[in-house]
Amino acid sequence: MRLKISLSKEPKHQELVSCVGWTTAEELYSCSDDHQIVKWNLLTSETSLIVKLPDDIYPIDLHWFPKSLGIKKQTQAESFVLTSSDGKFHLISKLGRVEKSVEAHCGAVLAGRWNYEGTALVTVGEDGQVKIWSKTGMLRSTLAQQGTPVYSVAWGPDSEKVLYTAGKQLIIKPLQPNAKVLQWKAHDGIILKVDWNSVNDLILSAGEDCKYKVWDSYGRVLYGSQPHEHPITSVAWAPDGELFAVGSFHTLRLCDKTGWSYALEKPNTGSIFNIAWSIDGTQIAGACGNGHVVFAHVVEQRWEWKNFQVTLTKRRTMQVRNVLNDAVDLLEFRDRVIKASLNHAHLVVSTSLQCYVFSTKNWNTPLIFDLKEGTVSLILQAERHFLLVDGGGIYLHSYEGRFISSPKFPGMRTDILNAQTVSLSNDTIAIKDKADEKIIFLFEASTGKPLGDGKLLSHKNEISEIALDQKGLTNDRKIAFIDKNRDLYITSVKRFGKEEQIIKLGTMVHTLAWCDTCNILCGIQDTRFTVWYYPNTIYVDRDILPKTLYERDASEYSKNPHIVSFVGNQVTIRRADGSLVHISISPYPAILHEYVSSSKWEEAVRLCRFVKEQSMWACLAAMAVANRDMVTAEIAYAAVGEIDKVRYINAIKDLPSRESKMAHILMFSGNIQEAETVLLQAGLVYQAIQININLYNWERALELAVKYKTHVDTVLAYRQKFLDTFGKQETNKRYLQYAEGLQIDWEKIKAKIEMEITKERDRSSSGQSSKSVGLKH
């Protein structure tokens, strides 16, 4: 990726340009110390003077009023705030009329920013004050006051907090009066510029110490640059939070959100005092010290999938290269390319007006449809369909171009959605809520309606990243997510009316990805690269989960690596320095998944015998139990040395009735409650009581015996035997109450038990054929 610089031969301003701001993706306003506000039209390459300000007004900062989200009519901003050296800020219309001038600070007003909703304005000045104003320019509050000038300010993503500079310090102050203020030393020199992105919640800072830094919202440094030759005078996030730009003297740099540099340009600009990204995130404008306005297009983005490599060579041209035969195709577009995604044998490209869908089998005839709103901010792909996110909503389309659905939820803000907060599978869409980060919304892909009974997926901590598995049946769909404590959890998407368990799968997990061909999960866990060959093991037999993992040392990937993709058996990891590392994992677990999904158990056993790996046998054991194939489970457990489980499986085979076998398989997986329910529904009350006795669940055993008026003496006898073994006296009041006047006769109890077993066997042989449903022999 690099920047394609365009700079006019002669500067359009006579003095330094202090600030720039985009109205649309093709129109820019610039303000200069020559008191002129100039409009630039990038389509016609024309400039026109909007207004000449009075000679005592030297503009310092400009910020356009945010356009209404999701309203088609208002496609561009209509007014802006301009801060100036005379201590005022001015509300100016698009045509250049000064609507209002407000005395704001003593000395220059160094920065002014609208919040994301456009309901409040924050200004900072040389007097060290931070002030909040209403939309119409009425003072609401003085948020802070200090002895040094405040050079830069930014709103938090939720518009509830403000970030501002204080010399070498950065301060995050909530608008609520008594809330905790976060303050930390960020640079060794005065901080000149800050920016806070609403999508990734990361902070940028630039200082006179010639460094730029990336921080999280808790003030922890994620990246610190090497010192440059000159102070860093400007930084700005791209709207989607994936890139940022850095400006200095004769320097413009394009960086990834993790800090490493994509491209460095040295235009003849003087210091770049202000950087603005276009609304679609494809181009940058810089306000230059020598009167120029520098424009830079982001080109040469690259997408890879299997043997295809797609490169954006120009604004409207892509090159497709097949690395197997070196065949090259050129794709020409009518408009500027904004976003693209290559996955699942399809390339999806959004331009400013249309969406193009190419198949990797045929690059010549794309499917084209018009977009409702031009600026697509996110494209996600699944095997059957893809998702487009723009300022107006979320839209699901098939690869044939057919519109499928558009999920909606209360308080939806599409401008802050990214690949970590939205996930797509063939049947489900998952979206993390921004208002309450502990909640995940789940939607049916085909209808866009909330999944099942509409109940939200709620977690105890804030969630940072979500991912749906890609294969298998809808009823088995799982979602994995990482919370703010870096714990990895997995849970079922379908709830079936019961409270589904959210189970912890790992700790200190920084990044995760599901395989696109089978349900294998990978992540970087602390200093280990970990692959969960069969994550569902946690629901079946968590004792053997460690045996189903593949682990290798991840220290070679340096700090904060990120998993880019997991295609087939190839995992691609982006290191902190920007380099890509490709890891190949064993292809056999994927083949095993394929055999099991087709119920080819004999082939699965044969494969495990051929591979001779413990992880394969452990996966097969868990898969067999999950699918109720106890014959295969017995072979697999024997292969991993779990002899106690082999014996238990043999004991299950000898049980007389189908229901008992089913209940004991459920118990094997730890589903005690479900096992008991199966037995009670089948009328096998004694067996339900007995499993509670075996588990020493004495309260429940007695409760069932009393409720069904049977085997109370059996429960009391086993309880007494248990107490005698440990030499203890009965203290439970309920047991003491029922034991009064009851004589325990073991002969009688054994006869009753024998009668129950005979009754179950007789009922099973008369009511059922010898074939056992749910248990394969």
UniProtKB/Swiss-Prot annotation:
Asked whether the keyword Repeat is assigned, the reply is yes
Q: Per the record's keyword annotation, is Membrane included, yes or no?
A: no
This protein's assembly is summarised as: Component of the IFT complex B, at least composed of IFT20, IFT22, IFT25, IFT27, IFT46, IFT52, TRAF3IP1/IFT54, IFT57, IFT74, IFT80, IFT81, and IFT88. Interacts with IFT88. Interacts with IFT57 and IFT70B.
| Keywords annotated in UniProt | Cell projection, Cilium, Cytoplasm, Cytoskeleton, Repeat, WD repeat
GO cellular component terms, alphabetically, are: 9+0 non-motile cilium; centrosome; ciliary basal body; cilium; cytoplasm; intraciliary transport particle B
Instruction: Give the species.
Output: Mus musculus
Kindly provide the name given to this protein in its UniProt entry.
Intraflagellar transport protein 80 homolog
Superkingdom of the source? Eukaryota
- WD repeat spans: 12-50, 104-143, 145-185, 186-225, 227-265, 267-306, 504-542
> Which InterPro entries does the UniProt entry name for this protein?
Beta-prop_IFT80_2nd, Quinoprotein_ADH-like_sf, TPR_IFT80_172_dom, WD40/YVTN_repeat-like_dom_sf, WD40_repeat_dom_sf, WD40_rpt
Job of this protein: Component of the intraflagellar transport (IFT) complex B, which is essential for the development and maintenance of motile and sensory cilia.
Q: What is its main location?
A: cytoplasm
Its localization reads: Cytoplasm; Cytoplasm, Cytoskeleton, Cilium basal body; Cytoplasm, Cytoskeleton, Cilium axoneme
The record ties this protein, via PROSITE patterns, to: WD_REPEATS_2, WD_REPEATS_REGION
**Which GO biological-process labels does this protein carry?**
apoptotic process; articular cartilage development; bone development; bone mineralization involved in bone maturation; bone morphogenesis; canonical NF-kappaB signal transduction; cartilage development; cartilage homeostasis
**Entries under Pfam families matching the protein:** Beta-prop_IFT80_2nd (PF23335), TPR_IFT80_172 (PF23387), WD40 (PF00400)
